[in-house]
């Protein structure tokens, strides 16, 4: 059986380029581990790889859903595992590339999700919020997960509902899943290589600032506007993700274009910091520094590692 490779790290660190290069070298196929790239029509703001950037490598879980369709960790876990099995059954190497920490965690340390879908759970807590108010919602979280309740302000109802949803789906406090408590990191199977990409903070932030500017220049605002014109609600989860929610602020006249750019870059930098914090908690990640021109060295190292893994697995 071919090994499974997982590539993680903060946004703008170079995961896509490495994943494609590695897939081309190893006859691999890529599974996206990104919670926004899974949606059709959300291309620029999600930094979805273009056909040229995909380099003729088959990609899975890109453009898989309509923006109005819900997508949960449980769904990702199921679809990604199906894709992994499909790829390995054909003698290819599955490579998961993404920065959505909970998605990746669900593949490495499979969570047992409740049989009922999370949409009904989310609907229940949304109705509870409407009827009882945000303070009561916050108290419900405090009963189930005191650490998350301490971390989240009562006004942050979206994240509170998310935490309550995960408590019910996994049977564990969301803070435990996030890593706020001592976590058990069991050894990885010999057929799995867990790769993390990083870079000095100033380089990551510089790349992020430049990428945000490039997204706006490439038509992020127009892409967002078109989605609204097509009838998609601005309250949809993917349209509340980084980039799209900032474009909406500008489109609705809440901020000027320079102010939109400032908070877009700031929030993306904060997001990258949270991503690094999440993945650095896991001692099983093998880290590589993606300083300029280092892709070739990382690629050669990973090809050698994978060759050794494949011989051991076989």
Curated annotation (Swiss-Prot):
Residues 34-37 are annotated as: Interaction with substrate tRNA. Its EC number is 2.5.1.75. Substrate binds at residues 11-16. SUPFAM superfamilies: P-loop containing nucleoside triphosphate hydrolases (SSF52540). GO terms for biological process: tRNA modification. The record marks 100, 122 as: Interaction with substrate tRNA. ATP binds at residues 9-16. It comes from the Bacteria. Its cofactor is Mg(2+). GO terms for molecular function: ATP binding; tRNA dimethylallyltransferase activity. Monomer. This is tRNA dimethylallyltransferase.
